[in-house]
C-alpha cells in the first residue's frame, strides 16, 4: 500500500468546522445537559434500573447491587455510577427533592471532608416522589431506545407528572454550552405551573418569587434582577451562608 493511500491531507480549519458541531451535540445530548424531564442520562439510567429492580415500594438493597445492575445501561465504571447515585440520595442532602431513600453514610454535599461509605455498606430504594415520575411509564408515554449493546430497552425520558427540571438544582458543562438550573420550592412550583396553564400572562414572580436551595442560605437579589432571569433564563445572584459556632 502506498504512502499516499494511508494519509489524507486536510486543512485543520476545515476539520474543525466539520466535526466540532457533531461532537458538541453528542456531548450535550449524551451526557452533559439535563433533558426536559430534569435528568441527565446517567441519572435516568440509575433510577430506571432501580424501578426495574422493584425498588419503588420494596425493601432497600445494597448500593453495590444497584451499581452493578446499572452497568447494563451505563458502561461507565462502578465508582462513577456510585458517585452519581450518592448525589440523588436523601443522605447526601444535595437535592431539595431527593429521588432515593438511603440508609448509611452518604456524605454531605456541604462537606469536603465527610466522604461517603463504600457501596457494600450503604442501602437504597426509590423515594415516594418517584411514584409520580414512573406512574405512566408502561402506558406508551415515552419513547424507548436500545442500550449500548442492544440487549435491552431504556427510556429516552421519564414521564414525570410535575416540572421536575425546576424542582432540583442541576448543573451541566458541555461543549460550547453550559447550564446551571437552580431549584424551586415544590409547592410554589406546582401552583405556578397550574396558574400558567390557566393563564399564560400569570406573573410567576408573585407565586414563585425566587429559587429555593437544599443547602439553605440567604439570597441577595432584587425583584428586577429576578424578573430578567425568569424572562431570559440567564443571570446570576448571590447566596449567603450562615456559620453557627
How does the language model describe each region?
Residues 1-233:
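Catalytic phosphate-handling regions of large nucleic-acid enzymes and associated NTPases
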Residues 238, 243-245:
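Protein-protein interaction/assembly regions in multi-subunit complexes
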Amino acid at each position: 500500500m502506498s504512502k499516499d493511500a494511508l494519509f489524507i491531507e486536510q486543512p485543520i480549519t476545515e476539520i474543525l468546522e466539520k466535526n466540532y458541531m457533531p461532537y458538541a451535540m453528542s456531548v450535550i445530548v449524551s451526557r452533559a445537559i439535563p433533558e426536559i424531564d430534569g435528568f441527565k442520562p446517567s441519572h435516568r439510567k440509575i433510577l430506571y434500573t432501580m424501578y426495574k429492580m422493584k425498588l419503588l415500594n420494596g425493601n432497600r438493597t445494597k448500593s453495590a447491587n444497584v451499581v452493578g445492575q446499572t452497568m447494563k445501561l451505563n458502561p461507565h465504571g462502578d465508582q462513577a455510577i456510585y458517585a452519581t447515585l450518592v448525589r440523588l440520595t436523601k443522605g447526601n442532602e444535595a437535592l431539595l427533592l431527593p429521588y432515593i431513600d438511603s440508609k448509611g453514610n452518604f456524605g454531605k454535599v456541604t462537606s469536603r471532608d465527610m466522604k461517603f461509605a463504600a457501596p457494600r455498606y450503604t442501602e437504597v430504594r426509590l423515594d415516594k416522589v418517584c411514584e409520580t415520575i414512573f406512574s405512566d411509564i408502561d402506558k406508551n408515554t415515552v419513547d424507548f431506545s436500545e442500550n449500548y449493546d442492544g440487549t435491552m430497552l431504556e427510556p429516552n425520558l421519564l414521564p414525570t407528572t410535575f416540572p421536575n427540571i425546576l424542582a432540583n438544582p442541576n448543573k451541566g458543562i458541555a461543549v460550547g454550552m453550559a447550564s446551571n438550573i437552580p431549584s424551586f420550592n415544590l409547592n410554589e412550583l406546582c401552583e405556578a405551573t397550574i396558574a400558567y396553564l390557566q393563564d399564560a400572562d400569570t406573573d410567576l414572580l408573585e407565586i414563585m418569587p425566587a429559587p429555593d436551595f437544599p443547602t439553605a442560605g440567604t439570597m441577595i437579589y432584587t425583584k428586577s434582577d429576578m424578573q430578567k432571569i425568569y424572562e431570559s433564563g440567564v443571570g446570576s445572584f448571590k447566596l449567603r451562608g450562615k456559620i453557627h459556632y
